[in-house]
């Protein structure tokens, strides 16, 4: 397994709309394993393939406190949304930034697992929010898109400044 490089805002590749996985192959399973390793190494609770410059509909999530209950969602689809919720969200692709984002309180999701078997589940609380956040990535959308242009530009400028500083090292 490998830790993959996580793209950071405002990288245009984060705006790519992911394509469906046509067949779950050993190569797709390797991508899933690498994404899980990357998510754990970066101390995230979710990761979409577009964040690691792989433009296929793959998401990994683990919201467990013990970090040993990974979920794999291939070609995920939200088939129902209920209620309203929102928490202050962060993102591995927008380091250091957090913002309150309106989300559905509960979702029903259909996806394939790492073996290509279809399954469906209901999610609420943090899992529902995480699923919606990661599926936004697959559509080329970031949580900063929910913010005002002023706030979004402040975050962009801050991250560009950090990037320039790191490049000088």
Swiss-Prot record:
Keyword Protein biosynthesis attached: yes
Keywords: Hydrolase, Iron, Metal-binding, Protein biosynthesis
UniProt: Fe cation binding residues: 91, 133, 137
Lineage top rank: taxon: Bacteria
SS bonds (residue pairs): none
Transmembrane regions: none
Cofactor annotation remark: Binds 1 Fe(2+) ion.
Active site per UniProt: 134
Cofactor annotation: Fe(2+)
GO molecular function annotation: metal ion binding; peptide deformylase activity
Biological process per Gene Ontology, one example term: translation
Class of the enzyme per the UniProt entry, highest EC level: hydrolase
Listed EC numbers: 3.5.1.88
Gene3D superfamilies: Peptide deformylase
Catalytic activity: N-terminal N-formyl-L-methionyl-[peptide] + H2O = N-terminal L-methionyl-[peptide] + formate
Similarity annotation: Belongs to the polypeptide deformylase family.
Biological role stated in the UniProt entry: Removes the formyl group from the N-terminal Met of newly synthesized proteins. Requires at least a dipeptide for an efficient rate of reaction. N-terminal L-methionine is a prerequisite for activity but the enzyme has broad specificity at other positions.
Name of this protein: Peptide deformylase 1
UniProt source species: Vibrio cholerae serotype O1 (strain ATCC 39315 / El Tor Inaba N16961)
Upper lineage: Bacteria, Pseudomonadati, Pseudomonadota, Gammaproteobacteria, Vibrionales
Gene: def1
């Amino acid at each position: 397994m490998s830790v993959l490089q996580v793209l950071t805002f405002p990288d245009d590749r984060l705006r790519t709309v992911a394509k469906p996985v046509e067949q779950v192959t050993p190569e797709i399973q390797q991508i899933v394993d690498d994404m899980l390793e990357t998510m754990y190494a970066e101390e995230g609770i979710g990761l979409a393939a577009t964040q690691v410059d792989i433009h296929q509909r793959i998401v990994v999530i683990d919201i467990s406190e013990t970090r040993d209950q990974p979920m794999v969602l291939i070609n995920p689809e939200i088939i129902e949304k209920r209620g309203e919720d929102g928490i202050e969200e962060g993102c591995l692709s927008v380091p250091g930034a957090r913002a309150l984002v309106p989300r559905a309180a509960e979702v029903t999701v259909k996806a394939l697992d790492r073996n290509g078997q279809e399954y469906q589940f209901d999610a609420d609380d943090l899992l529902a929010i995480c699923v919606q956040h990661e599926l936004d990535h697959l559509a080329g959308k970031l949580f900063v898109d929910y913010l005002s242009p002023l706030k979004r530009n402040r975050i962009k400028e801050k991250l560009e400044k950090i990037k320039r500083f790191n490049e000088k090292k």
